[in-house]
Design a protein with these regions (language model features):
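Active-site His/Glu-centered metal-binding helix of metallohydrolases
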Residues: 62, 66-70, 578
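Non-catalytic, conformational "gating/processing" segments within enzyme and secreted inhibitor domains
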Residues: 158, 210-242, 704, 726-760, ...
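M16 family metallopeptidases and their MPP-like homologs
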Residues: 45-55, 81-129, 136-147, 174-199, ...
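Generic recognition of flexible, low-complexity loop/linker segments
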Residues: 94, 210-214, 273-276, 319, ...
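Hydrophobic, small-residue-rich alpha-helical packing segments that form membrane-like cores
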Residues: 150-219, 225-243, 247-275, 280-282, ...
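His/Glu-based metal-binding/catalytic segments typifying zinc-dependent metallopeptidases
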Residues: 40-42, 49-51, 162, 166-170, ...
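Non-catalytic terminal extensions that flank enzyme cores
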Residues: 1-47
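Extended, regular secondary-structure scaffolds
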Residues: 211, 223, 232-251, 374, ...
Length: 974
């Protein structure tokens, strides 16, 4: 029976999506008005999404708090946190929920049919029948609440979203993104912050929170998406009978209104906080922003992706080069946001100064006028088109399911015109159209119309203010104290009581009979088979080649791995600088802008990285292998071009362009600073591990705080350091880019191998052959520092680390289960639910390194105390068989991720380089599947060993770190 025979639905459109190997169908549920879209294909990684148009009217963050709260229990699944129960006990390949400026979406994915149905069931129940109406405790936990432990205590505000957004508002990039959006749309929903402004979140009442759900969480306002290889008729019938038929079609006013164009550009100035010791000079962000039509124009939608590449994103692109040459900022970037109804094109200059605003605007507009007059670089346009078309055809979204990313892109048109859901799924004709326009003046006309003549734009200035965080914290504390002083004794007692009741609620465990309602798989549903390993050792042109034979749809993925042994410790940061400059500096035959375009016209791109491997059969020796890797991908007939361009980058790069090197150092410094605010948890964990782990110290010196300190020193003292920098880059390149230093990894089908071997001859004998200096083994010196790094952030990233193998405890597969147990039970309940942090996680690897870390955490000392309690938690670990099965299934879910061809090849090579055999993986899988509670209790020794190391690092607010200064051996400003 076809879906057309289902009487509950009306078929509105069918679409041949052959470029995506799919058939598209748009339906409407007759009774409820729910919109339903199907993408049928043979992809086993099935996706379900339900989304709602949720335009906020203020910055209280109600869409965001709602997204968190509906996943905290529902009618059929009345447990306190079904989301966490699913994470612990399902085979999901994706499970999350996301709040956007105008929509909220709830996607799930799984390859297992039974599991997929379970995920759909829990999510449908969550959005339509959440337990938020039963009491206000979920709202107070996830959103915000006053916290007063005793009548004489300090009144504070807590809440998961509240603390998450405090962290988000600490990042200048986050502030910039919000102010740009708000500045361009003062009269519609984009004028406010859907995630919530921490200053405004406490204005949200419980009743207004419930009103938001009543208004927007109705099938009439819903968008349901099903993707993959499944029985669509069965799913549609279930949706109808189980949920949609319970509702009548109701008009829901959720329309996203277009902003009336401006008659002149607006200017907005906003401050952001920097640490008291930071300089305000060269710390301003300037942004030039224009509104570009609507997302319903599929040609414009892609054309500005191409223009973003050609004008801004590519190294040496004209707008980027002009601003750098003028000295307006040190890191120039572009942004094209086509995920809102009216897309935004931005030119952003970081590390600039307020007084440069006029020059910033003048340089941009003069450069654009010159481009319109003299024509845009045609090769840059072709490179941009090929770059985006290659990615569309390859559909490699990394760890994210393909169907998930297609679904999110559908919303770019479907949300604003329900008759046009597929327009961005049929991109090949649009790419063909754009190729035809390269020589016609089409792109120049777009620049004139949308960037020069268009007055619907803004200039946004985000300028630094020293101590702003401390000032705002004091203002909030004074405000809360004044509020407390205004309360009667009865009102204060009521706050203390409410605080205690929320804590008691958080302490309560869900009833066993409620937990039993969450559908789970059994261990018998899990295969004991491991994923295949595709490694075949060959030799080509005298070099070891590891071939990974998989079907790649005609694309060859190659990596050249150069061994880094023999590089002394003091030169490690220079390896990373070398890795960063190659491909974006001039070579013998190309200026760097033309080099990048040449690569992207013919290939799928070339990139470089530093990787670390260890022989897992010899972990106690603490030896590891570091490699410099250059990776690229191309269609088989273009492999010769790919290797030719790799050779150009490795052997012909010009390190003598001092001006370009200084530009790159400034960009690196800026981006490292950004990463400390956005990914402080990984930075803190790495730094803490580096106190005793040579491998982690190598990583920190090439990608962490140690690296940042060297880059900062070089950039700020460039004139006196430049000769040393250039000499080091040349010497390291000559030392490592050698044929006798090389292993090749290549992923392709069998017929792609011969073409690769033939193409490789172009590079094999041109690598360095001159005699090397005598190599001295690299000795890495670790020093225990236990550091606190002060930033302008309002939240902390708190890391405890240690090596358990050093203390006589062996690795076991059960540690992978422990990661799930800690991250979604002990740490989740204590650090996130009770502590209010946005995230918390743990990790344990085969070489004995382990860590506990929190993310956007309002606490410091309290979190450290929670870490100390983990050993007792494990010693007393006691769950029933059903819960134990859930933890095991959640662990396997993390391991059994579907892989695209590139991932199959890179995983196989990773195992090869780490000396991990199929037998080891099979043993680990068996240890996971056969684990008992006693195995988990035995892991208390692992955590005791980790804590006994007494290694810690915290990145966070000046105030919190100074309050706990006795915790640290060193305190620094980052």
């Amino acid at each position: 029976m076809s879906i057309y025979d289902l009487n509950a639905y009306e078929v509105l459109q069918t679409e041949d999506l052959s470029d995506l190997k799919s058939k598209g169908t748009l339906l409407k549920h007759k009774k409820s008005g729910a919109r339903v879209l199907l993408m049928e294909n043979d992809d086993e990684n099935k996706v379900f999404t339900i989304g709602f148009r949720t335009p906020p009217s203020d910055s209280t963050g109600v869409p965001h708090i709602m997204e968190h709260s509906v996943l905290c229990g529902s009618k059929e699944f009345p447990v306190k946190d079904p989301f966490v129960e699913l994470v612990k006990g399902s085979l999901n390949t994706f499970l999350n929920a996301m709040t956007y400026p105008d929509k909220t979406v709830y996607p799930v994915a799984s390859c297992n049919d039974k599991d997929f149905q379970n995920l759909m069931h829990v999510y449908m129940d969550a959005v339509f029948y959440p337990n938020i109406y039963q009491n206000d405790k979920t709202f107070r936990q996830e959103g915000w609440s006053y916290k007063l432990d005793n009548p004489d205590g300090e009144l504070t505000i807590s809440g998961v979203v509240y603390n998450e957004m405090k962290g988000a508002f600490s990042s200048p990039e986050g502030v910039l993104d919000r102010v740009v959006l708000n500045s361009l749309f003062p009269d519609n929903t984009y004028s406010v912050e859907s995630g919530g402004d921490p200053e405004v979140i406490p204005e949200l009442t419980y009743e207004r929170f419930l009103d938001f759900h009543r208004k927007y969480y109705h099938p009439s306002n819903s968008y349901i998406y099903l993707y993959g290889d499944m029985n669509m008729e069965e799913k549609l019938r279930w949706l109808d009978e189980k949920y949609l038929s319970d509702f009548e079609n109701e008009p829901v006013d959720s329309e996203i209104h277009l902003q009336k164009p401006f008659t002149e550009m607006k200017e907005v100035v906003q401050e952001y906080s920097i640490a008291s010791e930071e300089s305000e000079e060269d710390n301003t962000y300037l942004s030039y922003n224009k509104v570009i039509g609507t997302t319903l124009d599929e040609k414009l939608y892609l054309a500005f992706e191409i223009l973003d590449y050609a004008l801004l994103s590519a190294p040496g692109a004209p707008l980027k080069k002009a601003l750098l040459d003028a000295g307006v900022g040190k890191d120039i970037s572009g942004s094209y946001d086509n995920g809102v109804y009216q897309p935004i094109f931005s030119v952003i200059s970081k590390n600039a100064n307020v007084e440069q605003k006029e020059e910033f605007v003048r340089v941009i507009e003069d450069t654009l006028k010159d481009i319109v007059k003299n024509g845009i670089n045609k090769k840059a346009l072709r490179a941009g088109i090929n770059y985006h078309e290659f990615r569309f055809r390859e559909a490699d979204f990394g760890n994210y399911p393909r169907g998930l990313m297609y679904g999110l892109q559908l919303f770019d048109s479907w949300l604003y015109d329900e008759t046009k859901p597929f327009i961005h799924m049929q991109a090949i004709p649009t790419f063909e159209f754009l190729k035809e326009q390269v020589e016609t003046g089409y792109f120049e006309e777009l620049i004139q119309k949308y960037l020069l003549d268009n007055t619907h734009g803004s200039i946004v200035i985000i300028k630094p203010e020293r101590g702003r965080t401390a000032r705002m914290d004091k203002e909030l504390a004074d405000k809360l104290q004044a509020y407390k002083d205004s309360l009667s004794k009865e009102e204060i007692d009521a706050l203390v009581k409410a605080t205690k009741e929320l804590e008691e609620y958080q302490e309560e465990e869900s009833a066993p009979e409620d937990l039993a309602k969450i559908p789970v798989l059994g261990r018998e549903d899990i295969s004991r088979e491991i994923a295949p390993i595709y490694n075949k050792e060959l030799e080509t042109s005298g070099v070891k080649l590891v071939h990974h034979e998989v079907e790649t749809n005609g694309i060859g993925y190659t990596a050249l791995l150069f061994d880094l042994s023999g590089i002394p410790e003091e030169k490690l940061p220079y390896i990373s600088i070398l890795q960063s400059v190659l491909g974006i500096i001039n070579t013998k035959n190309y200026e760097y802008s033309e080099l990048f375009n040449e690569i992207n016209v013919h290939t799928g791109g070339i990139g470089t990285s530093l990787e670390l491997y260890t022989d897992v059969t010899k972990v106690k020796e603490k030896e590891f292998r570091a490699t410099f890797e250059i990776k690229g991908k191309a269609l088989y007939p273009k492999m010769d071009v790919l290797f030719s361009m790799m050779r150009e980058i490795l052997m012909e790069s010009d390190f003598g362009d001092e001006k370009r090197l200084k530009e790159i150092l400034a960009m690196l410094k800026s981006r490292l600073q950004m990463s400390f605010l956005s990914s402080g948890h990984t930075t803190a964990a790495l730094r803490s591990l580096s106190y005793t782990s040579p491998m982690a110290k190598f990583k920190d010196d090439t990608d962490g705080i140690g690296y940042y300190e060297v880059v900062k020193e070089l950039e700020e003292n460039f004139e006196e350091k430049k000769a040393e920098l250039i000499a080091n880059l040349r010497q390291i390149a000559q030392q490592i880019f050698r044929k006798d230093n090389l292993i090749i990894s290549y992923t392709s089908s069998a017929d792609g191998l011969a073409l690769m071997e033939e193409a490789f001859t172009k590079i094999a004998d041109t690598l360095h052959t001159e005699e090397k200096e005598a190599e001295i083994p690299c000795e890495i010196h670790c020093v225990k520092r236990n550091e606190g790094f002060k930033t302008s952030s309002k939240v902390q990233y708190v890391a405890r680390t240690g090596n358990f193998i050093d203390r006589g405890v062996e690795y076991t597969g059960a540690l992978q289960i422990l990661k799930v147990i800690l991250s979604y039970d002990y740490l989740w309940q204590n650090v996130r639910v009770k502590g209010g942090a946005y995230g918390c996680m743990s990790s344990f690897n085969r070489i004995g390194e382990g860590y506990l870390v929190s993310y956007r955490d309002p606490n410091l000392e309290k979190t450290m105390e929670i870490y100390e309690g983990v050993v007792d938690y494990l010693k007393n670990f006691n769950v029933d068989d059903r819960d134990m099965n859930k933890f095991i299934i959640g662990t396997i879910s993390n391991i059994d991720r579907p892989m695209n061809p590139a991932a199959k090849g890179s995983r196989s090579m990773n195992l090869y380089m780490n000396h991990v055999s199929a037998e080891m993986i099979r043993e680990e899988r068996d240890q996971i599947l056969d684990a008992q509670q006693s195995d988990i209790r035995a892991l208390a020794d692992v955590l005791q060993a980790l804590l006994d190391a007494h290694e810690l690092c915290v990145i966070g607010s000046e105030e919190k770190i100074e309050e706990q200064k006795e915790m640290f051996l060193e305190i620094k400003t980052l």
